[in-house]
Amino acid sequence: VLDTNVVSELRKVRLGKADANVTTWTESVDAADLFVSAITIMELELGVLSIERKDATQGAMLRSWLEQHVLPEFSGRTLPVDTAVAQRCARLHVPDKRDERDALIAATALVHGMAVITRNVADFKLTGVTIINPWEVMQ
């Protein structure tokens, strides 16, 4: 399950401006095996809306990327927050309250038996989910 920062970096891969390790990682995985959480889509939408308010040109470019690339690419591979995910997320909050968005992404991955792909390892470390950081050199 791709975290938001990874989806954003994938945009740079297309432009030839991504981190070299991330580019190498993307070449080593089958795109059909990559999923996003509905929470990741929400975070991307929030980011685009925020940029649109500040910079119309940049906002239009990001809107186009989201609607013409991200949403079609992950059509059928966007995992919802359903009852199982909500319940697993609640268990991640007790006894240690954590960021709800990250907990929902972690819970989504746990329920579906997947890893979280992220640069923000610390945000997911205590959830028990398998974490892959494509910014680090793969062994």
Predicted regions and their residues:
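Acidic, PIN/NYN-like endoribonuclease modules and their adjacent C-terminal/linker elements
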Residues: A106, L110-Q139
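A generic structural signal for short hydrophobic patches within well-formed alpha-helices
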Residues: V7, I41-L44, A86, F124
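Conserved beta-strand termini and adjacent loop/short-helix elements that scaffold enzyme active sites
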Residues: S37-I39, V81-T83, R119, I132-P134
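Structured helix-beta-strand junction loops
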Residues: V29-A32, E73, H112, T127
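Short, conserved active-site loop motifs that form the nucleotide-linked donor/cofactor pocket
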Residues: L34, G76-T78, V129
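Short, well-structured N-terminal submotif of metal-dependent ribonuclease cores
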Residues: V1-V36, T40, S50-E67, D96, ...
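Residues that scaffold the ATP/ADP-binding catalytic core of kinase and kinase-like folds
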Residues: E9-R11, G47, R88-L92, T127, ...
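Active-site neighborhoods of divalent-metal-dependent phosphate/nucleic-acid chemistry enzymes
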Residues: L46-I51, G59-A60, L71-R119
